[in-house]
């Protein structure tokens, strides 16, 4: 008995270590551990190639938290790591090193064969990624240029590196270096947007004044850039007043997607005064972007009830639909808080609207995440009490069970039982929820649960396939040796 307990304790300890890899904790790297410390962590069972849920692996965590060069080199050489490994947002180590301004590491990664033209999931090369996030060290740029990247290369929409980095280049030292490489402060992108416009996103009035003194022309696009702000900060009211009242830009300017300043700032923190300023300057909250979204639709996708109320008071029709047939209530159900959902309904938002992708129930199911299960339940209760027929099939015959099984979450399916949905309903392809679950299941839990609430395993799809037939083609079940005999 003692032996069994001891073995179980060892297994539990190993499991917990696997779940809490110390090298995936940013605080570990902030202590700047040397190679000996890292080796010690590896010896304890911490995997140097492991990644967290966001796909930040140990190496990218080390780079982003300023670990020393030798330690990072050691980690890159560990099994499972390489300079071509993709991490968070499809970025490779060269992306992170460039953004961090780690010149020695950038040179090392270039020497090791990193792809300098490799784009991440957002379409950014390593140098463009670094420039866009404010890296202004000329040595980083010089390393890429020395390795073959052309200084005058055009990126997305004709942007140059100078345009991307200008807003963070407070003393224009990087700009001075880049102009020596053939770039110019007079460069514009494919839409005619200038260095002034790009710099406006950082909201540095002194820099903007300096650029004007150097002959850089502002355009109305500067306001749109300013309203987007940066990843780390929002533009303040003083900057907007400077752009509108001194530079004389039009407050009702629109971006390339038809959006106004309000579309961009509505979900940022502490914007009430700025929102009122633009409304007073004539910006109409009812203006829609190219997808048909008005400002209320954007605002409703947050938990900021005050902002929703502020915009709703100026919105002509709370039931305006966008190109997908969605109203502001759809956004609230999918992304907003239960309080926002309730408020919109109280203000007359219709609950019986059907968008191209389904009714409010479908949108709610699509938004489900285990960590937000309580909010999900609240919103499910709100819409069910306000006229949404959650048991009715969608236009293609699918029910919420069909949608729900794709989440592979037992708790979600259990929350749907009280809705009295027909678990054996077949869609236009004659597929039941059990059929769909058989295709996407990662284990047998969901499949067995559906059977327990009455799913019929003998029903067939339009191609004469049973749930067993479909499950037998599920590679995940096969690879994990999950028995599906219970579906026969």
Residue ranges of model-derived segments:
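Ankyrin-repeat boundary/"N-cap" motif
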Residues: 20-29, 50-63, 85-95, 119-131, ...
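Ankyrin repeat domain, specifically the short helix-to-loop turn at the C-terminus of the second helix
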Residues: 39-47, 73-82, 107-115, 142-151, ...
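Ankyrin repeat A-helix N-terminal signature
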Residues: 31-33, 61-68, 96-102, 129-137, ...
